[in-house]
Amino acid sequence: MIILYIGNVGYPDTAPSIHVRNRAIFMKSCGHEVHVLCELASDGKRMEEVDEVAYQYMDPYPGRGKVRGAFWNLDQVFGKFYFKQTLKFLDKIKPDIIILYEPNSILYVLKMLNLSKKEGFKLV
């Protein structure tokens, strides 16, 4: 199976990123293909690449400082930017299962639920 994690798990040395990486390594050992789609940290740091996990980074939010923060805050409510970024990778990866790790917007989750029914992948 192809499993895709989506969430803010691309920041090095944070509990969520370490948790997802360890789970992905375990799932890979069980024979699954694992991808992680995450935000790029504002400082540009990335997770250490490991053979078991393929990290894909979303485009950063536009602007800098307060402008970037405003886009991020709006996306916490509406999830539009996050959803568009997700769609860019779904065609490439074609997952069987998507795991939303701490999704940022209920509207994003609802869009993903509708998409899962249309495209036929399982959503966790």
What are these regions (language model features)?
Residues D43-G44, S105-L110:
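Short, well-ordered alpha-helical microsegments
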Residues M1-G44, E48-V53:
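N-terminal subdomain of nucleotide-sugar transferases
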Residues L87-L107, F121-V124:
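Short N-terminal targeting/anchoring amphipathic segment
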Residues V36, Y55-Y57, L123:
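Conserved beta-strand scaffold positions in the cores of enzyme catalytic domains, especially
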Residues M112-V124:
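Charged, glycine-enriched surface loops/patches
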Residues Y82-L90, M112:
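Generic hydrophobic alpha-helical segments
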Residues V53-K84:
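A short, charged, and often flexible helix/loop element on the N-terminal side
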